[in-house]
Amino acid sequence: MMNLTISGKQNIEFYLLMVGLGAAEAYKYKHISLGVFESLHYDLSMIVLIDEYQLSKDLREIVFQGMGMEDIVDAAEWFEDFDWESHLRDAIDYLELDCISRLMEPSYHTCINDFTLFDVPNTDSVEHLYISFVSHHSFEQIMMIFMLGYTVFLIELGEYCTDAFDTFKRNYLTSLRAINRGESEVLSEVLELFDSCDNGNDFLSNKRQQLWLRKISIDLRGHFFRLKESSMNYRSEKGLVYYRRPKETILN
């Protein structure tokens, strides 16, 4: 069983927004189903978590937006001429833009520099979110969704991408590599993709890095396309469980 700990409300929100962004990106390209999309982030149980931690109203609204995708899909059964695919695509684009613009707010600037998924809590003065993955497979899938969200975010940072990308590699990818220890070939391959992303210092290096990150996002999305939906059910304890305190379940 794999376990992660995220400390502090801002870091918890930052993580949830990244997972929400990654889920939206994978769903937009039809590489995960609506059911998987909802179980990853856009579910009433996530509202319970947000309320429990008294997280931001904006994050709450983003989750409700994602839950609204089901209404668009259902409308296709009721209205013969309803162009539900165009409406759905626009709704997902809107959702992604909300996630990205929220992540760019000043309150999350410190998260870009300091965020880590592998905290060791040493104080009760801040909130902690404990995440238990029942299998290495579920850990692998959620990490891929998180990395997909982070990759999309880095691309949108444009000229400010380089420093944020270096921090992402230092604070997150290095720790993930140590935890994975080659156990998952899929994660190892993804980490190699990030390692080979060129961040030289010539005048086109920033643009070249963004293009490489776009290629990585395509590879990450493609991974989910090859999975069976039954292997990505996060509405049960077969996948992951969130805790407010160790061994105290608040969401699964």
Language model features with spans:
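Acidic, Ser/Pro/Thr-rich low-complexity regulatory regions
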Residues: 1-252
